[in-house]
Amino acid sequence: PGKRIIGERAFDGAPGLRLALALPPIEVAVTARLTDGDTVEFEIPVPDVEAAFVLKMLARTVRDSERDLQDIETLLEIVASQPDYHASPWRLGDPKITKAGERGDAARVAAQMISSPPTRVPARVRALLRRHVAIVSR
């Protein structure tokens, strides 16, 4: 875990990537305008909300980024809004699911965040974690 330097580039470890690649993605249609004015249209797969959440939660085990915390809050707000466009259902609220594996690892990070002081994790994020992630005691 942590940053690795390969060549002249720094890379963070990517715990949770296996889950993100295993779950069905959300297909996003993109129309990009090029600098010459032409447009290119394509579809790109992005991780589903749950897979992205697990990635971001597990990223906190190797780095402490304000951006990751903002992304976690955004993903939880999406879950709270109950959108129809999930590629797969949100399962992190089920204690049977959060007992093991990458989802379990993410739930353990959530438990740490919930018990963090408000100066580290905002109250809204802690409330959303309590509401949407089943914390299983070991």
Across the structure, where does each feature detected by a protein language model lie?
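Compositionally biased terminal segments of proteins
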Residues: P1-R138
